[in-house]
A protein has these predicted regions:
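Substrate-binding cleft of secreted/luminal carbohydrate-active enzymes
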Residues: 64-82, 181, 290-377
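N-terminal substrate-binding region of glycoside hydrolase catalytic domains
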Residues: 59-163, 298, 325
């Protein structure tokens, strides 16, 4: 909100005097300060420090009071041809739900963050594969949004025009609304396999720059932004610690984490191979944010049944975890993460997931919150 210009001066014209203004009842996020000398234009002004202090109200979005969203990344290539039942759906929601015997309330999908891509691509995929479930409610859509350039280029504004166009398209899609988008931009930034790792300072600048554009275009009030590192920083240096990449509570709605045992080429100590231990780092980043396993699953480097048991022990051991997403596929580097690759582990998953705590539907209270936020963001 606009405020009247205020002039600060001191008797000598050159002391270290501080000016102070109380805007305790002004709701704003951005502050613009224009500094102008009262003397002639040739007078030099020496500004030592400017501080703006205040409180930011940052409430939590779409957190179920009881339970945890049951999610997955279920690509068709995660199923052998003979198990696809003739399906050609690249997002094999129906096959995965049949496999585990329970419906999903959250689906993960991916798109590169680069010029030439647009939101309508994802909205079309969303309409085809997420749709409505059998009780007339939507599944949540978790959107892995992957940059292909280093963070310094993003921090310098190289993607500004792309983000403006993209978020304007998101804001215009409310007529085709299917619930809020859960943006998960530039995940696993503390892992050396991403093109945007290793530069925490510019990562924070890039994230805030992207978020500010989204906010100014009316996207942040309704949708969700998930900040999501890898559970283990690689390399494990202090400079590459996940906390260094955190853009701050006021720029993040949920904390996410990629939760896997070591790859075939990596070496972890035994106690860092399983979910309950791997979750410890993300909890230290922010004290209050809700947490999700934004992708995870076992591999050939761990005991599959122990992994599944710990996955479901999150209910009692880690109550801040309010969503879990199983990544159901295999690759050469990480081994076979598919639930169906181990019949005993699959049967254990099918048994434990039947607990109503693992939500197959979005709760009514969350739907009410969705409608309220949607109406307030118009």
């Amino acid at each position: 909100k606009a405020a009247s210009p205020i002039t600060y001066s001191d008797s000598n014209g050159k002391s270290d005097a501080w000016g102070k203004t109380d805007f305790s009842n002004v709701a704003c996020r951005y502050v613009k300060a224009t500094l102008k000398s009262s003397a002639s234009t040739s007078t030099m002004m020496l500004i030592d420090e400017i501080k703006v202090m205040g409180e930011f109200h940052n409430d939590m979005k779409y957190v179920p009071e009881k339970g945890c969203y049951h999610g997955a990344f279920p690509p068709l290539y995660g199923f052998d041809p003979e198990d696809r039942e003739g399906s050609t759906d690249q997002c094999a929601v129906a096959l995965f739900e049949k496999l585990v015997g329970k419906q999903l309330s959250m689906i993960l999908w991916y798109q590169n963050m680069e010029p030439g891509r647009n939101f309508s691509e994802m909205q079309t995929v969303r309409e085809k594969y997420w749709g409505k479930n059998y009780q007339g409610k939507y599944r949540f859509f978790l959107y892995g949004w992957l940059p292909v350039i280093p963070t310094q280029q993003m921090a310098n504004g190289e993607l500004d025009d792309f983000h403006k166009s993209y978020f304007a398209e998101v804001a215009a899609q409310k007529v085709r609304d299917m619930g809020p988008i859960w943006f998960r931009p530039a995940n696993e930034m503390n892992g050396s396999w991403t093109p945007y790792y290793g530069d925490p300072t510019n990562y924070v600048k890039a994230w805030r720059r992207m978020y500010n554009i989204a906010e100014q275009l009316g996207v942040t009030a309704y949708n969700v932004f998930v900040w999501s590192p890898n559970s283990v920083s690689m390399p494990g240096t202090e400079a590459n610690a996940m906390k260094n990449y955190y853009p701050g509570d006021m720029y993040v709605d949920w904390l996410g984490v990629s939760c896997y045992p070591p790859s075939l080429s990596a070496t972890y100590p035994e106690d860092r191979r399983y979910p309950l231990t791997l979750m410890q780092g993300i909890k230290q980043v922010s004290a209050d944010k809700p947490i999700m396993i934004s992708e995870g699953g076992y591999s050939s480097t761990c005991d599959h049944q122990r992994w599944v048991r710990e996955w479901f022990k999150l209910k009692d051991e880690e109550p801040r975890v309010k969503a879990v997403v199983w990544e159901n596929h295999e690759n050469a580097e990480n081994g076979d993460r598919r639930l169906q690759s181990d019949p005993l582990a699959l049967e254990l998953y099918k048994e434990l997931v039947q607990d109503p705590y693992w939500l197959d539907l979005i709760p009514d209270a969350v739907y009410s919150e969705i409608e309220t936020r949607k109406n307030n963001s118009k």
